[in-house]
Amino acid sequence: AVLKDGSCGSIGYGIATAYAKEGANLVITGRNVKKLEAAKQELESLYGIKVLTVQADVCAGCDNEATVANVVKQAVDTFGGIQVLINNAQASASGVPLAEHTTEQFDLAIYSGLYAAFYYMKACYPYLAESHGSVINFASGAGLFGNFGQSAYAAAKEGIRGMSRVAATEWGKDGINVNVVCPLAWTAKLEQFRDAYPDAFKANVKMPPMGHYGNAETEIGRVCVQLAMPDFKYMSGETLTLEGGMGQRP
């Protein structure tokens, strides 16, 4: 099964759709039960797969280890194992300058992103080792390029990148490859960011050289499918920027 943390957003659903079209059974998590159930019904009816939905949220002050352990147990009990783990969930107060950030806003980003990836990777490790599986974590150009107003978000994402590189080193012996994707796609969340923080949006979001924003399924999700395929098994510890030519680095 493919376990996806954070599947109701535009990019998350695009990834789920790409895997569903390959015939993969899915475990999808999120906070909104109605959105999870709607996603389950649509994916199962369109693609003939099985989808397990589990309401789960990693947050400050919660028993996060128990929450994640419950998700993983349900996944294994339902499907017998886990072949792919995708950590896509993230919440943050993007647009708030560092000096104005509150501890609560910082915790929101770190718990929903970095801690969530940590708990899921730790809990899924035995099953990924058994299946010689793949981990695909999500980061962002916010951390790569120091985007204005995104200090907590960037901190969470760069923490995920560092942890992913360590996992690639430690888990290579188990046949697990671990990679990171930094996407740019036009989504409802990006629209909300534009409306809530117009100055930060203008400073950070440009039209990519390719002339369009990425499609969540075909240009982000399909790459995630390939990263778990045998042809890409030897690639591990890498960061891929799927930003239409905007995420160029030395």
Feature-to-residue mapping (PLM):
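Residue(s) in the substrate-gating loop at a strand-loop-helix junction
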Residues: S140
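Canonical Rossmann dinucleotide-binding motif of NAD(H)/NADP(H)-dependent dehydrogenases/reductases
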Residues: A1-V27
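Catalytic Tyr-x(3-8)-Lys segment
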Residues: D57-C59, P198-T218
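Substrate-binding pocket helix/loop in short-chain dehydrogenase/reductase
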Residues: V96-L98, T102-D107, F201-N204
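Short C-terminal tail/terminal secondary-structure segment
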Residues: G95, F145, K206-M207, C224, ...
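Short, small/polar-rich loop/turn modules that mediate ligand/substrate recognition or access, typified
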Residues: G172, N177, M235-G237
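Active-site helix of classical SDR
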Residues: M121, A156, S164
